[in-house]
């Protein structure tokens, strides 16, 4: 199967590298990382020790059987435009943080669009090198819920490459649960410059729990059954499992890059039908940092 990974950052490179054990892979990205992969291959270290040699380019090819989108949420519109120029994209799977990505892709593409989540931990440690901080699974399915042959095909592609993959019929609930996890962990660790496990202890635990509970309330308002303590338990479970990891938003802040806070905490603020002061404050603080410090480069 020909798989295009659109967004050769840390997660996209890790997923592409793992899929490359079985499938033909094209990584689409930019900058020094793509040049290094093109010249010397992609090296995975940490929990996975592997070198693969995918095609690396700055624009998508004409066709693919599966496209995995891993760009930052703010780059989804540009990704959708680029993928729309393909003759055939096959099945499109969003493995992105935040909410609203699938809708943006579906509006621009004729291909079936799937939603996905993953708990793989990835960190780019140098051009052409990505460290796997934790082996996880991929869960995917139609973003509106239910079953689809496209989801079955995509799930099979991951399993063929030795990746634990589940095809799920309850993606709306899973996406909101992931949003609660990200809303609690990402901005708190980014602002405090701490590893994920720090949100399990005060003074940060109360803030992270508050963000997760507010996200559950917004989910309920959207018609998704997610209880506040379920959201907290999910957030704390991920924080415990990834206690020594650096969150993606903290990586962005420390690198001076824009973050995905608008698609995470900002999304909760937009969708909530009651006050969400914790998410509003976190979104404002990270947004204020971006306005003053984040550089223009979004790669």
Feature map (PLM): residue ranges:
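NAD(P)+-binding Rossmann beta1-loop-alpha1 motif at the extreme N-terminus of oxidoreductases
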Residues: 1-53
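Short, well-ordered alpha-helices that flank and scaffold nucleotide-derived cofactor binding pockets
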Residues: 17-21, 81-85, 107, 266, ...
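Rossmann-like NAD(P)(H) cofactor-binding subdomain of soluble oxidoreductases
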Residues: 31, 46-131
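NAD(P)-dependent Rossmann-like dehydrogenase/reductase catalytic/cofactor-binding core
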Residues: 209-299
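Internal alpha-helical scaffold of NAD(P)-dependent oxidoreductase catalytic cores
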Residues: 86, 104-111, 131-178, 190-230
């Amino acid at each position: 199967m020909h798989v295009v990974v659109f967004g050769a950052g840390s997660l996209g490179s890790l997923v592409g590298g793992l899929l490359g054990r079985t499938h033909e892979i094209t990584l689409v990205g930019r900058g020094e990382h793509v040049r290094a992969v093109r010249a010397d291959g992609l090296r995975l270290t940490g929990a996975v020790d592997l070198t693969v040699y995918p095609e690396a380019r700055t624009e998508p090819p004409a066709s693919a059987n599966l496209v995995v989108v891993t760009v930052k949420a703010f780059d989804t519109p540009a990704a959708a435009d680029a993928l729309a120029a393909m003759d055939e994209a096959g099945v499109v799977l969003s493995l992105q943080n935040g909410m609203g990505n699938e809708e943006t892709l579906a509006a621009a593409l004729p291909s079936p669009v799937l939603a996905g989540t993953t708990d793989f931990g990835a960190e780019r440690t140098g051009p052409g090198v990505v460290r796997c901080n934790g082996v996880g699974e991929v869960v995917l399915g139609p973003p509106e819920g239910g079953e689809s042959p496209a989801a079955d095909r995509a799930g099979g592609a991951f399993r063929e490459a030795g990746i634990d993959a589940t095809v799920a019929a309850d993606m709306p609930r899973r996406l909101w649960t992931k949003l609660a996890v990200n809303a609690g962990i990402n901005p708190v660790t980014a602002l405090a410059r701490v590893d994920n496990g720090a949100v399990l202890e005060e003074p940060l635990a109360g803030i992270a729990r508050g963000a997760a509970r507010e996200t559950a309330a917004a989910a309920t308002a959207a018609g998704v059954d997610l209880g506040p303590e379920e959201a907290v338990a999910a957030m704390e479970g991920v924080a415990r499992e990834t206690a020594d990891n650096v969150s993606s938003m903290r990586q962005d802040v420390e690198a001076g890059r824009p973050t995905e806070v608008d698609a995470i905490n900002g999304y909760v603020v937009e969708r909530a039908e009651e006050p969400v002061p914790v998410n509003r404050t976190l979104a404002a603080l990270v947004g204020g940092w971006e306005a003053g410090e984040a550089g223009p480069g979004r790669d």
